[in-house]
Every structure is written in structure tokens, then in C-alpha cells.
């Protein structure tokens, strides 16, 4: 009897072992299947990410029609075959941007974008300094520096600081103005445009022409920055307003004036009380638009060329804006401020003496 019981227990145990072994094999197979699915899903997401970036370039780049896209997709996908993460596609995207040939399209990783969103102070950087002064003889001088922040609180601060400075200078009743755009390498144009708006005599002074021939003009009114009739951003300026008298204005430019710095300069082209003193600008006069990708990276594409109030197109990379009154051999250096300021004063006095 005991032997029979022992035998039954052994048979039951063997069955249990078989069940456990089956479950382990099944679980192992299931885990392997899930791993394969996960790897496939990861591979698919990498491919989709790269495709999204390439699709944006093909659809939005101003030079899209000049490129062999079938070949570009093929080469990019081949380069991404061994990509293990989305970050592995960044060099491929950057390499493709170079093929666009506009010298202005860029890629910003999520980490770089995060720094732009945090702004200057939260990343341990100094907020751009705006120099201003009433020069001997009663001439107002103000500097508009580069501005590379996507922090909207800092956008407001940038404009309010500039407006405070020009309001203070205007209260001194200057004979004329010098707006210094030298070495303004660009950054965010909306706050720059809002800053200089009190000096502009009309709307539709700066815009772009896209690859389909459509014009888009930027404007600033009642604290809002517009693209055509679409309000893109509402500045919080606390009701602050500035009015500048119509008098001679000299815009100081050099080879370090680029991108949004050039757009600011071009905003004044064709305005009668404006003169340009310095050297030619950088020549990055294309219009860019940022696109947020799935992981938070920014793909910034050149989608058009800058146009002035007369719809003159600034399409040639490197040509830049030419000064009315050249200062020879200054390049990027501002060590010869005396030469710039002396010429600016001379131009202002000439304008004042001309009926």
C-alpha cells in the first residue's frame, strides 16, 4: 500500500515537473518573441524618426527641387542600418542638411533645445548686454546684440531692456541715432524685430519668399509679432510704449552681422532717414523655420529667402548687405570704433544739413 502511494506521488511530481518545464519553455519562447517585437519596434521607430526628418527637408527646404531625393533617402537608410538608437541618426540628418546647400539649415539635439528653452541665466550664461550712450555732440548710440534664447520670459526682458534704453536716450533729445548691429550673429528674430519697431516707419518691411513664390511679411503691433495676419507671439511688455522722433539714423554693420542680425538691418532698407555704415554683412539672409521632432530635437530648415519692403530678394549666400558708407578693412573687429563713430556722425550731420 505504501509502495502504491509512493508511486502515485512520484507520478504526480513528474507531471508537475513537466508542467513547470513546459511553462518555462513557453515563457522563454514568449520572452524571446517579445524581445524580437521590442527590437523590431525600436528599429521601426528609428526608421520613422529618420523618415520624418527627411520628409520635412523634402517638403519644406527652399532648395528641395534641386535635389535627387530618391538617392538621398537610399543613402540615409543605408547609413542607418546599424543604428541602435534615435541619437545614432543625428549625424545622418546633419549630413543630409549639408546637401541642401543653403548654409543655414541646422539640427539641434534635445539637450541643445533644452538649453535654449531654459535661457541664459538658468544655464549659467550672461544675459546679452546692451550698451547705450549719448555721445559727445548729442548723438544717441544703442547696441542690439545677438539673442539665442527660446525662453519667452527672456524674450520679454530683451525687448523691455532695449525699449527702456532708447526711451531714456530719446528723452535727451539727440540729434540723430546710431543702432549698432555689428557682430550681431543672429538668434531669435521676433524679439529683435519688436525691439527696433519704434524706429520703423511702416509695416511689411521684412519678410521672406518661399520656394513656391509666396511672400510672408513679419510685423509687430500692439505687443504681438505677426507673420502676415497670423499672430505668432504676444509679448508681455507691461503697457510700455516708446515713440522715436523721425531723425537721421545710422545702422552700424560688419561681417559679423549675420542671420537675424541681418534681418534687423534689412528691415531698415528703403527707409529715407536710414544710412548704413561699415562693411558688408555675413550673407546668411535665408528665412528659417524650426520643426520639433519626436524626441524633442529641432530641425531648423531654410524655407525661403529674405525680402525687404520693396520685395527685393536676398538669395545669394555670402553676398550680404552692402553699406552706403564703407569702413575699409575692419572685418569682424570693433577695435576701430573711432572710425565707425566718426563716419556715423559725419553722415548724421550731412543728413541734418540737407533740406
Protein language model annotation of sequence segments:
Residues 1, 147-149, 306:
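Short regulatory "switch" loops immediately downstream of catalytic or recognition motifs
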Residues 1-36:
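Bacterial Sec-dependent N-terminal signal peptides
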Residues 13, 136, 245-246:
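Short, well-ordered loop/turn elements at secondary-structure boundaries
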Residues 16-17, 71-74, 209-214:
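Short alpha-helical "patches" and their helix-cap loops
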Residues 31-178, 354:
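Terminal targeting/pro-maturation regions of precursor/exported proteins
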Residues 33-60, 87, 181, 185-355:
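C-terminal "post-core" interaction segments
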Amino acid at each position: 500500500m505504501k509502495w502504491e502511494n509512493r508511486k502515485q506521488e512520484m507520478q504526480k511530481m513528474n507531471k508537475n515537473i513537466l508542467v513547470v518545464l513546459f511553462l518555462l519553455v513557453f515563457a522563454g519562447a514568449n520572452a524571446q518573441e517579445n524581445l524580437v517585437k521590442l527590437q523590431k519596434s525600436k528599429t521601426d521607430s528609428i526608421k520613422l524618426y529618420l523618415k520624418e526628418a527627411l520628409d520635412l527637408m523634402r517638403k519644406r527646404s527652399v532648395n528641395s527641387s534641386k535635389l535627387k531625393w530618391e538617392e538621398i533617402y537610399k543613402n540615409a537608410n543605408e547609413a542607418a542600418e546599424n543604428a541602435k538608437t534615435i541619437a545614432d541618426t543625428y549625424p545622418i540628418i546633419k549630413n543630409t542638411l549639408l546637401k541642401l546647400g543653403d548654409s543655414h539649415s541646422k539640427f539641434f539635439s534635445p539637450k541643445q533645445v533644452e538649453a535654449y528653452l531654459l535661457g541664459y541665466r538658468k544655464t549659467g550664461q550672461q544675459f546679452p548686454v546692451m550698451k547705450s550712450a549719448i555721445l559727445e555732440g548729442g548723438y544717441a548710440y544703442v547696441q542690439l546684440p545677438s539673442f539665442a534664447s527660446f525662453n519667452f520670459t527672456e524674450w520679454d526682458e530683451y525687448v523691455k531692456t532695449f525699449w527702456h534704453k532708447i526711451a531714456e536716450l530719446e528723452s535727451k533729445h539727440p540729434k540723430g541715432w546710431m543702432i549698432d548691429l555689428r557682430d550681431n550673429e543672429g538668434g531669435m528674430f521676433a524679439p529683435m524685430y519688436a525691439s527696433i519697431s519704434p524706429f520703423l516707419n511702416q509695416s511689411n518691411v521684412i519678410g521672406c519668399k518661399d520656394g513656391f513664390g509666396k511672400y510672408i511679411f513679419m510685423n509687430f503691433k500692439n505687443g504681438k509679432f505677426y507673420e502676415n495676419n497670423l499672430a505668432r507671439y504676444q509679448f508681455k511688455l507691461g503697457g510700455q510704449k516708446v515713440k522715436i522722433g523721425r531723425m537721421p539714423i545710422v545702422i552700424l554693420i560688419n561681417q559679423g552681422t549675420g542671420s537675424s542680425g541681418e534681418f534687423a538691418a534689412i528691415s531698415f532698407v528703403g527707409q529715407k532717414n536710414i544710412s548704413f555704415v561699415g562693411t558688408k554683412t555675413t550673407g546668411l539672409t535665408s528665412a528659417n523655420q524650426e520643426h520639433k521632432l519626436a524626441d524633442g530635437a529641432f530641425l531648423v530648415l531654410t524655407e525661403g529667402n529674405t525680402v525687404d519692403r520693396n520685395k527685393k530678394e536676398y538669395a545669394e549666400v555670402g553676398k550680404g548687405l552692402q553699406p552706403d558708407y564703407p569702413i575699409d578693412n575692419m572685418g569682424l573687429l570693433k577695435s576701430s570704433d573711432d572710425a565707425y563713430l566718426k563716419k556715423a556722425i559725419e553722415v548724421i550731420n550731412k543728413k541734418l544739413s540737407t533740406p
